[in-house]
Amino acid sequence: MMKEFLVEITTTIPNGTNPAEVNARRAAEAVRAKELAATGNLGRLWRPVGELRSIGLWRADNEADLHANVLDTLPLRPWMSVSVTPLEAHPNDPGPANPAT
């Protein structure tokens, strides 16, 4: 069973980067995100209103796997700063991870 992680990502495009490269990476990023969603690695993704960052629920076998085989495969990763917080279910979580017994 994969573990869950809260991942905050801020992407900063280096000054002077060719706009065509930016557009190509963004297009590739969208494709890769769909692939990671299909495998269950990307659960949810949000963008705070008025901010150029994302907050997501990501899944992987462990944190090393999350970095090496998930986040590091993102085309925009070289321009990202990433903060990862491992998560576990809260005893009062009403979600399906804690079915009534």
Predicted regions and their residues:
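Conserved, structured core segments of small domains
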Residues: 1-101
